[in-house]
Curated annotation (Swiss-Prot):
One of its GO terms (molecular function) is ATP binding. It comes from the Bacteria. This is Alanine--tRNA ligase. CDD domains: AlaRS_core. Binds 1 zinc ion per subunit. Signal peptide: none annotated. Zn(2+) binds at residues 562, 566, 666, 670. Transmembrane segments: none annotated.
Length: 876
């Protein structure tokens, strides 16, 4: 039974049993800072289980794409070396939101697994576990399903604390939780391993295939378990694992999905064996990287993008190990789309983007390796002792993306040790910085306890009278806030826009009969809109009538920039192509910043085109319309949804420009007519990560100011080059070209002088035990010229050791060369190190060529004079 057939059968079975088939959610969790990537089927229903969201169905089934790489759930280093570890996997699941419970859930699982209409697995091969005190589940398995009691195992608190058990599931320290029952397949006594709960349970004999979680309690901060009024069910069965069982193989990499990918990888890599762990790594990583890119993640140095970058580079590194000499990952995408594109249409739609991103990242990695090798070489030249410091290893990895394992390979070649303890100290410090910055480290159940909601009125008004529902001093509720005290204010209604969708929160003032609260920012906390600031006069009390007034100037300026962002997005897609997608934005009163997916820098002509298109839409002065509709209707109208944003069942659709030039889902504040924007100008365009570009732009008065200052600067330049606005650019180009030409001529003169001086020095070489030895100083010569001159002298002298030094900017540069045959006894690296240390510096390199330097110039003559004796000592 093929993997695709198992997936279809699972969804069909539960659909027949009244479940809504829900599409897999994105691998990027929407509006959930606790989670790096979607790693379980229940992630998209988290708010439903917590009672914060309501769906129009109470039972659902999914095939959810998942990634476990980075963060708490990290399988990356095990991938390729075990039978069942993956960075990407599919989780089949069925869910009940207060509908059915234990009896139905257990019966559904058993019927699907064992019925001849479905998977038809031998019942005698199945063993189940239940939580030790879950008598209800035990009774259902034993007396209703008919599983022999000796194959029902009770698992207690086996992790050192109450309710800490393999068979008790918890969302966090507090919140929904409950027992679970797991179904295992017994491969038989000929396979090593014991049953669940036994000392040798980690063997391969008993393999877990399905986990059924019963959410029946709410755990409070005091550790008490309170029954939920509507218990729920969350189940999960890994597609790869059940496919291995159904296809009679013991490794997930032997199932049909992987076998075809492995064969394709072998072909692309010139026939490498599919048994190679390297190919299993590549087959796994092409799945996770491709799906992540399809869901909008791009390689970068922070957050989710850094994990993607690590996955891609790990795959590329393993490709290099089996002979890859050029980028190859992008060549595997077509086969992946062929295998999984029907089940996941977003993969097929993004094929071109995935291929380009992978190719670009592999090319960048090749450059990184080259740069990293040079940096490592430099660090080794400065090394004191035989151990590479942990900080150096960390910097190469963290700043330059240079793999730790590659640093280790080079260390072994040089007989050097690695300070991995120091590396771990640096890594932990980075993790601490990330936690303190709040990157994916927020506790979902922590924060303000706000049990009230606010209505936003700011689309139609910027001021009004409302009621103060709640006050907070820090995270503590307060009855009043007094003068000078910082805090938070929640109103029943408010015209203040809470930060969202890249638009900053409003500022302004809240006034009561007894005081004034200055609002510095506005944010959303659950269903409440929170005004952040401080009391500037008197005091503010709960229950008072509050006159709220938004800073009109800042709101208007922000609206200009937000509306311009929509026009910019549409213009970029028109000029660059439909692959352009928003990756992030910042909209405030001063400017707009827009990050978007694109694979190369924009040309000046493309920037000019985009500016012209946006300004044409501004001059058209068309009205901006908003309409609230269902998500399906919005999609039919062509509205763009933005990466990383969370949308409800109904959405606000914003249309602007001629012939609906731009249609997007947006809850932000905007101009009434495009002409209100006034003017649009792009101030800069640059890259922020591989495949991501950033535009910073201005509108209205700031745009006019920018144009005027740019014009004044151009006039100043024209005067300096004795031209005018029309000829200034050509004159500057001519000056630059002339400067380059003069620099070349200066370098040539320096090289000739060095060569001439070197030729003269050849006569000064001393015979040391049949070897010509020359140590001398050349004035006014840079390091490159020194190296060229050393090569010339080696060729001229024959069997020779040459060391030359020059002084520039208060530092001595040293280059040494030894002819090939003699470098076995006299090593250039050792020679440079000996001389550099006398000058208070460092040096090193290859046996035939090395370089270094020092700062104690007064010792240079003595250091050069010591060379002959040192060489004699090396020759013995």
């Amino acid at each position: 039974m093929k993997s695709s057939e198992i997936r279809s059968a699972f969804l069909k079975y539960f659909q027949r049993n009244g479940h809504e088939v829900v599409a897999s959610s994105s691998l990027v969790p929407a509006d959930d800072p606790t989670l790096l990537f979607t790693n379980a089927g229940m992630n998209q229903f988290k708010d439903v289980f917590l009672g914060k969201d309501k769906r129009n169905y109470d039972r659902a089934t999914t095939s959810q794409k998942c990634v476990r790489a980075g963060g708490k759930h990290n399988d990356l280093e095990n991938v390729g070396y075990t039978a069942r570890h993956h960075t990407f996997f599919e989780m089949l699941g069925n869910f009940s939101f207060g509908d059915y419970f234990k009896r139905e859930a257990i019966n559904y699982a058993w019927e699907f697994l064992t019925s001849s209409d479905w998977l038809n697995i031998d019942k005698s091969k199945l063993t189940v576990t239940v939580y030790a005190s879950d008598d209800e589940s035990f009774d259902i398995w034993a007396n209703e399903i008919g599983v022999p009691e000796e194959r029902i195992i009770r698992i207690g608190d086996n992790k050192g604390a109450p309710y800490a058990s393999d068979n008790f599931w918890q969302m966090g320290d507090t919140g929904p939780c409950g027992p679970c029952t797991e179904i295992f397949y017994d491969h038989g006594p000929h396979i090593a391993g014991g049953p669940p709960g036994s000392p040798d349970e980690d063997g391969d004999r008993f393999i877990e295939i399905w986990n059924v979680v019963f959410m029946q309690f709410n755990r409070t901060a005091d550790g008490e378990m309170h029954p939920l009024p509507k218990p729920s069910v969350d189940t999960g069965m890994g597609l790869e694992r059940i496919s291995a069982l159904m296809q009679g193989v013991h490794s997930n990499y032997e199932i049909d999905l992987f076998q075809e990918l492995l064969a394709e990888a072998s072909k692309v890599l010139g026939g490498a064996s599919i048994e190679e762990p390297a190919l299993r790594v590549i087959a796994d990583h092409i799945r996770s990287s491709s799906f992540l890119i399809a869901d909008g993640v791009l390689p970068e140095n922070i957050g989710r993008g850094s994990v993607l970058r690590r996955i891609i580079r790990r795959a590329a590194r393993y490709g290099n190990k089996v002979g890859a000499t050029e980028p190859f990952l992008h060549k595997l995408v077509g086969k992946l789309v062929e295998l999984m594109g029907d089940a996941y249409p977003e993969l097929k739609a993004s094929q071109n983007k995935i291929e380009k991103t992978l190719l670009l990242e592999e090319e960048q990695f090749a450059k990184t390796l080259d740069k990293g090798l040079k940096l490592l070489e430099h660090e080794l030249e400065q090394l004191k002792g035989m151990t590479i410091p942990g900080k150096t290893i960390f910097t190469l990895y963290d700043t330059y993306g240079f793999p730790v394992e590659l640093t280790n390979d080079i260390a072994r070649e040089r007989s050097l040790a690695m300070d991995m303890d120091g590396y771990e100290v640096e890594m932990e410090a980075q993790r601490k910085r990330a936690r303190e910055a709040g990157s994916f480290g927020v506790d979902y159940n922590a924060g303000l306890n706000i049990d009230v909601s606010s209505e936003f009125t700011g689309y139609t008004e910027l001021a009004g009278s409302y009621k103060a529902l709640a006050l907070f001093a820090g995270s503590d509720k307060a009855d009043a806030l007094t003068v000078g005290q910082q805090g938070l204010v929640v109103l029943d209604k408010t015209p203040f826009y809470a930060e969202s969708g890249g638009q900053v929160g409003d500022t302004g003032v809240l006034k009561t009969d007894t005081g004034v609260f200055v609002v510095k920012d506005t944010k959303k906390e659950g269903a409440a809109i929170v005004h952040i600031g401080a009391v500037s006069e008197g005091e503010i009390k709960v229950g008072q009538t509050v006159t709220a007034e938004v800073d009109r100037h800042k709101r208007k300026a922000t609206a200009l920039n937000h509306s311009a962002t929509h026009l910019l997005h549409a213009a970029l897609r028109k000029v660059l192509g439909d692959h352009v997608a928003q990756k992030g934005s910042l909209v405030d009163p001063e400017r707009l910043r827009f990050d978007f997916a694109h694979f190369e820098p924009m040309t000046q002509e493309q920037i000019r085109q985009v500016e012209s298109i946006v300004n044409a839409q501004i001059r058209a002065n068309t009205s901006v319309s908003t309409e609230v509709m269902g998500m399906d209707a919005a999609r039919e109208r062509g509205a763009m949804a933005l990466f990383g944003e969370k949308y409800g069942d109904t959405v606000r659709v914003l249309a602007m420009g001629e012939s609906d030039f731009s249609i997007e889902l947006c809850g932000g504040t905007h101009v009434e007519r495009t002409g209100d924007i006034g003017m649009f100008v792009i101030a800069s365009e640059a890259g922020t990560a591989a495949g991501v570009r950033r535009i910073e732009a201005l509108t209205g008065q700031p745009a006019e100011n920018w144009v005027q200052s740019s014009d004044a600067l151009l006039r100043d330049i024209a005067v300096l080059v004795k031209g005018n606005r029309e000829t200034a650019a050509d004159k500057v180009r001519a000056l630059i070209e002339r400067s380059r030409q003069l620099e070349k001529e200066v370098d040539q003169v320096k090289a000739k002088l060095a060569s001439s001086a070197g030729s003269d020095l050849a006569a000064s070489a001393v015979d040391v035990k049949g070897l010509k030895v020359l140590a001398a100083k050349l004035d006014g010569v840079d390091r490159k010229a020194l190296m060229d001159t050393v090569d010339q002298l080696k060729n001229k002298l024959g069997q020779a050791v040459v060391l030359l030094a020059s002084v520039e900017d208060g530092k001595a540069s040293i280059v040494a060369g030894v002819t090939k045959a003699e470098s076995a006894k006299v090593k250039a690296g050792d020679l440079v190190k000996m001389v550099a240390e006398q000058l208070g510096g460092k040096g090193g390199g290859r046996p035939d060529m090395a370089q270094g330097g020092g700062v104690e110039l007064g010792k240079l003559d003595a250091a050069l004079a010591s060379v002959n004796a040192w060489v004699e000592g090396q020759l013995g």
